[in-house]
Amino acid sequence: MNHSLILKDSPNIDFYGLSDISNRVLWGDAFSVLDKIEPETFDMVFIDPPYFLQLPKRKLYRWKVKNTVEAVNDDWDKFASFADYDNFITSLLRKVHRLMKPQATIWVIATYHSIFRIGKIMQDLGYWILNDVVWVKTNPMPN
């Protein structure tokens, strides 16, 4: 069977079996796609949720290098409040948890703006945090 690497979600699809999604990227709204996958499917889950950077509406200048911060300014990273963001993360983590096998591992990518909120929510939902992995980025935004 010849599958393309990318599988675009469709409202006409009600269910994805493991053979449908194995070694593929599912392109679509995460909340919709996650609901279509059988429970306890994955041994490992990797999520990179919105960071909710809350950058000001004005330009942020980097005085030492004489330029401005080019930040995420897309709708998918905007939330009306911390409560809205927390509700989004809670919903996402519940949906993901349903798909994880009992001994599965989850990796969550975040920034210092959001990782502690996400970690608290994970603990409140019963996730056990084994470790923190810190990637040192030499050109972070804003710097």
Question: Where are the regions that the model predicts?
Answer:
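Core catalytic lobe of class I
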Residues: M1-N143
